[in-house]
Amino acid sequence: MASPNAASDAATPASVDLYRDTPVRFLGYANEVGESFKPLIPRVAYLGTYGVACAYVAADANDKYQRDGDAARGVDALIWQALASVIVPGFVVNRVVATAGRATTRPMVPTFCGLASIPLIIKPIDHAVDAAMDASLRPYVLKTPTASD
């Protein structure tokens, strides 16, 4: 996954980022799994997946802030993660599941389509969010390095 500060997030043994370079990263995709299973699970379970993903986003943003006390870096991580891990992929998977649900009467097909879409959408969304933030928030509001810096 790309990151708000890609240049400083190189995965060397001394600088492994718990939230970006380890299996903890998968917690950010909990809501996409919830979107995939939405037609089959209770609403409280579906909403719980968003709780897990939002907690992950908040933890990563807090970690980025705590590392060097730079509030802009924490806000950058919060916005980037919210967009790239929760909002945009949640919307995309929701639409995949809804579209598949209209195309079939088999209850598991939309779930499988939603789950199958997750690995396909991650990188394009990450890059799109990086590009959008590099062209707007990072240089003008947050004054943080762009993803290509």
Describe the predicted segments one by one.
Residues 1-114, 128-149:
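Glycine-rich, hydrophobic membrane-spanning regions of integral membrane proteins that mediate transport
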Residues 113, 117-124:
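Hydrophobic alpha-helical membrane-associated segments
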